[in-house]
Each structure stands twice: as C-alpha cells, then as structure tokens.
C-alpha cells in the first residue's frame, strides 16, 4: 500500500487532537465530532466530500437507535417496567442474592431495550429495594450499570453501538453487492455475547466481597458519633445481639452511656432502653442509614454543652439525620482545620461556633493519638477533620472561615427545595401491613416520612418504627422534587390532592408537575389557597408548598401564601409556557420526569414491545426480514402514541440528540480515515498480528482490545464507528466472516468499565451512588482485564460456541447456587471458610481490610482506650496514624 499523503496526515493529526479534547472532557463528543467532520470536508474533497460526510446522518442503524428511544419511553411511561422489576426483585438479605436478583433481570431487559432508560428507571427502584433489604446500595449500583452493558451484548438491538455496527456492515457490503455478508440477524451476536455476559456476571459475584465498595463514602471515615435511642425505636427492650445493630456493615458500637455511667465494652446480652446513648464508630452516611433504619437520633456538641450546664434540651435543639422541620439547620459540612487557624490549641467549648461561624460541631476525626474526653474538651489541632451542622448564619465566603478551615464539602444538604406532601394508601396497596421501612419509603434519597394520619383520625409519629401501614392511612412526607417523582410512580399510593387534580379535567396523558415561585408583589400574597380558588382560576391543583427555611405543616388549602413560596403544581404540560409571564409568579419551570404512570396502558405498552421484538425473532429464524427494525420501532411508537402510552412531547424529549450527532459525525470521520488510507494502514498492523500468530482469533482479539481501549477514552458509539472500517478491511483480507468482525467490535465497544465517564450508564450510577473515581477503577480495571481474557477465549473458539455456552452456563449455575449448598455445612466449617475469605480480601484490598480491623477493634475493645493512635502500615510502605475515637461523656440528666 502506498504511503499516506498529506490528506492522511491531516486526518491523523485532526483525529488525534479531537481524541485529546474528548479524553480530557473539555468538549463533548457530539460537538467535537461534528466540528471535526466539518473541518475534514474543508479540503476540496481530498479527505472526504460533503456528500459522503452527510451520509451518516441517514444511516438505518442510526435511525433505529433514535426511534428505539421512543419505544423505551412509551413502555416506561406506563409504569410497567417498575411493576415487573419490583415483583422480580423480591426480598434478599445478602449481597450475593441481591446481586443475582438485580443483575439478571436487568441483563435480560437491556438485551431488548436501550441501556440508558433501563438504568434510569432502575436506580431509584434499586436504591429503595436495597434499603428495604438491608444491603448497601453502593454494592448494587456499579453492577447495575455493568449488567445493563453486558445484557446489551446479547442481541443486535441491545445497545446503540450494536445497531450502529449493523448499519455500517449493511451499508458496506450492500455497496459491494455482497448481500450475504451484509446480513446481521438479531441474535447473531448471542452465541458469543451471552457467554461474555455470563462470565462478567460471574466475576461480579465472585469478587463483590473484595472489590465492590460498600457503604464507604468520599467523606471522613472512622468518626465517633453519639446517637440516642428514640422511645419508639424497634431496638428498645431488645438485647444488643438481637437488635441487628451489630450486623450492620461499616458500623461499630464502641460504647454506651446510661444513667450517668459510661460502658466501654457493651455486653451482647445488654438490653437496650429508650434514651440510651450509643457511641457509633463509622462513617457519617453509614451511621445515618443505621440511624434512620433503627430509630436513632444524633447528639451534637451544643446538646452536650447544654446538658453539662444543667439546661433542659428539647428535640428541636438537636440535629437529626434528616431535617425534621423543627430545626432551622439545613446542612452538614465537612472541613479540615488549617495550619494557620487561630482555633488551634483551643478546646471546642472555648469557641463561639454559632456566633462566629454559624456552625455546630457534630463529630471530629483525630489522627494524632492524643487522649481526649468529651467533645467539648477536645483541643483542636491543625489537620483535624470536623463534621459540622450549619445554621442560617453560616457563610463559607467569610475571611474568618477561610483562615481556619479548608477542604469544605457539603456532606448532607437539606437546603434543597423540600415539600410536605401527603399520599393516601389504597385498599389493595402492597404497603399495607408493612412498616414504613419494609414498604421501601425510608432511606430513599430526598424522602423522609414525617407522620401518619390513620383512617380513624388518630395520628402516628414518624419515629414509630414499628407501626404497620393500613388501608386509608395518609402518609405525610418531606420530599424534594426528585422524590416527588418517585412517589408519583409508587404503586398503591395516591396524592391527598388527587381529587383536586382530577377536577382540573386534565388527561393523565398530558399531566405533569411544575414549580412556580410566588411573586412578592403578586395577587396571591397574603391569601390562602382556598380563598384564591386556585384550581378554578388557573385550572391546576397545588400539590405541595415549599417555604425557605420552614416546613409548612398545614393542609394545602389552608396555607397563607407568601412571596417566595414555591408551589408544586399538577397541571397540563402547556401550563408552564402559558403562565411564564404571569404577574403572580416570578419563576415557572417544569419538574423533569414527573408525569404520572399510565398504568391503564401498561399491558398495551408491554404487548407492543413484545410484538416488535417478535418480528425480529421470527425474521431471524426464517432468515427473511419481514420488516426492518427501524420502521418496526417507528410503528410501535406510533401505536403507543395512538393508545395513550405517551404523548408527543414525551416522545420528542426521549430522543438523545447528542447521541445522534456523535454517531452520525463519527460515521463521516471513519469514512475519511478509510478514504485517506489511514484505516488501511492500521488494518495492516492487525493483519500482521493475525498472520504472525496464525488463525482468525489473534486478529479478532487485536480488534477487540483496540476497540475496548478506545471505548475507555471516547464514547462507545464513537469507538465502534471509528474502528469498524479498519476492522472490516482487515477482515476482508484475512477472509474473516463479516459477522465475526462485527461481534468483536460490538463486544469491545461495550467494554467501558474503568472510567465512570466512558459510558453513560456508568456516569449515572457514579452520581447516584456517590462513588469516587478510585472506587470505580478498583472494580473496573480487573473487570476489564477479566473480560479481555474471556473475549479472547470466545473469539478464538467462535466455531465451538455451543460448547462455550454449556461451559459458561454450568459455571454460572454453580457460582449462583453454591452459597445455598454451603449453608448445609457445619458452622465450624462455615466459620473457617469465612476466615479464609477474609484473609483473601485483606490480601486483595488492604484499604478495606484496614477499615474492617478498625471497626472490629472499635466494637470489641472500644472501651479500653478512648483514643487510638497506633499506626497501620500502608500499601505504599509508609505509615499513617489511626483515627482517635473521641467519646462524648454525658452527664446525669435528660438526653437527646
């Protein structure tokens, strides 16, 4: 092949610069590829002509991707997927079975629906389910993304990349009049994708103990936090060993204060009493979860000081794990004491925290091994990490704050708009005869149960963790807008204001929620919702009201509106546009994903999707395409529109135009690389690998690895589109079937597991689970290596796919069910195996092992030393001081 001329050099340099821009995340791939393609057309057709550059925008594979978003939106709007998944998930108490129950259904679902919608609706379902089952949500969210990706490798419609490759293969070989080579059936990838997915699933199951993060967070670890056992807590009158507190992951009980006496080593047979003070060693978010689950309230330094001074302290003067509405304090923050802080050397008691900073100490992480007593007696030192509650006077921009503190992080933000919203329990609701926790309504991000109004007129406080919900009960909840969307889709519940909503006459098909801020000079100020006759005047119903700094406890109709109040309104989809300039409001905006589910259309939506899939299955079995997936998707979506599964606006918004632009432009860029001979040169390198080793396998492995690496740096769609012409040239020269080439690229393009920004579903769970990049890489890097080995084996033995299927299914079945068989062994054998796996875990992940040792030491020997200052060896050979545990010694009087 001749040397690459100047057009090829320009193309290489241009693509390289674009890769750097996208890898650094300076500009998104949709904009970058579009500009790159336009630039490559500016050389009088020497690199690529305008006509060829524009051809990608009409590619049938790309059009299929776009219109499948309509189908996914239609079935999601009916609420059918949530109902099915809640039923399939069931209940589990172990991480092993939780992963099995959550990953398998998602893998099956994502084989036929786009990954992004699957993960979007599964995140809140999975988080609620995890809380309900007592499993750390962080153990499940990364596997959720991986399961969606793995499931997508099982069919040609499983991912947008698969459809793109199918479209490119069809276009390439039809132009060459090779119709047999152009065909790629719906299940042509299944013989290789299913074993690939199963082995990925097996890896997650085997390594979840060692590599998956638990309830760890990005914030300070090994804090010692004091909590009070609330009178209605389910642990009252239970022995410690029977309470469930000792079995919580990442949570250790290090001491107990009762009746003026401190117990450093708590006997497992100790019976817990109301108002006991428990000293919990762990991370703030772990203690928060356990506190909400078991009915525990947080104790602050201010509470301790008041008690020490002999003052009576009410509940409103302490901080709860969730804003209770009684306290004006809205956020918990984490800060580090600076070296130049004038607070260094002073005790916590000596600092006027509220007056000077608008802050109240909650916990301190120590690292120097000094003996400290009560929280107020701790002598502050540079480098101390503090968890602080904020007051309305807190201002991070003040010079005084900057001098004393650095590394500010908002650990818990309660200042987001929070609405009080009421929901009624329907007669046949699944939550009937369940506690709030068992119903999945406690521990949901942005949602907090305030109280329950019973059907007989009596009221139950939210702190009653034992109350079982009954038909006709009204649950009053504090919820941000995201949680309101979750509530609107929760089966068996309906809004208290539902009657008012129905009276507006707006069809459920065009109903959604809007936020509208009341103008300070508008006509609504000073009037109740009832006096205004809001529904009659605006043809909309107020569902809830948010008032800055104050939780509004009144029923909506009786609230006297004030300027600045934010109204949550159920209305027609065009209401926001019609009232955007209304003098009564200063800000009107729609709440995303707030349309109520059209459950009456659920069966229709599911049947239409099944019908669409069946057209492709039958066509594949008959080796005759009855209808292409693109028009099949459009017709399915059209029927969904006609039957009321979704409306036209929802269909328009469902299309991800950034994906469309990225794929379309990447088609043109790949064509430019082929026209200039660059693709051929790279293909020659792959051909050389194949010829030097021998056989098709090495060449296919090289294609897979190159695509996988590119997928980590770019998007999966871009990686597939860029690599296809290169791989196709190599395949043609090596006489490798076109289907095999496409399979290698499809598998490689989906292999974006290390970088949370490499795949859209990764990014979604990264944000929802509050992961760090390191946590993602800890599981992602070995997972990537494992799948490269698996893919290499599969690609080398493609002709023996039946034997590979039998082997992988057998391995999967063994891994899934062996834990159930192990429970039949004697307890002594089980304990030895547990210890053996613990040693393996320590060898693989020393950081996690260190955290477990600290927790165990705090739980078993917490009373023998108030501060622990020993050092632990780090993996890099250095040492780091262990964290001192600072106990809050409580005086003999009433406690919070």
Curated annotation (Swiss-Prot):
Induction comment from the UniProt entry of this chain: Down-regulated by sulfur deprivation.
GO biological process per UniProt: potassium ion transport
Predominant location: membrane
Biased composition range(s): Polar residues: 868-881
GO cellular component, one term: plasma membrane
A Pfam short name: TrkA_C
Residue intervals passing through the bilayer: 1-21, 47-69, 106-126, 140-160, 186-206, 602-622, 626-646, 654-674, 685-705, 734-754, 776-796, 804-824
Domain spans labelled RCK C-terminal: 212-296, 319-404, 408-493, 499-586
PROSITE patterns, sorted: RCK_C
Protein family (similarity comment): Belongs to the divalent anion:Na+ symporter (DASS) superfamily. Na+/sulfate symporter (TC 2.A.47.4) family.
Purpose of the protein: Na(+)/sulfate cotransporter with a probable low-affinity for sulfate.
UniProt entry keywords in alphabetical sequence: Cell membrane, Membrane, Repeat, Stress response, Sulfate transport, Symport, Transmembrane, Transmembrane helix, Transport
Subcellular location per the Swiss-Prot or TrEMBL entry: Cell membrane
Source organism (scientific name): Chlamydomonas reinhardtii
Region Disordered: start-end pairs: 857-881
GO molecular function: monoatomic cation transmembrane transporter activity; symporter activity
UniProt keyword Acyltransferase present: no
Membrane topology of this protein: Multi-pass membrane protein
Name listed for the protein in its UniProt record: Probable sodium/sulfate cotransporter 3
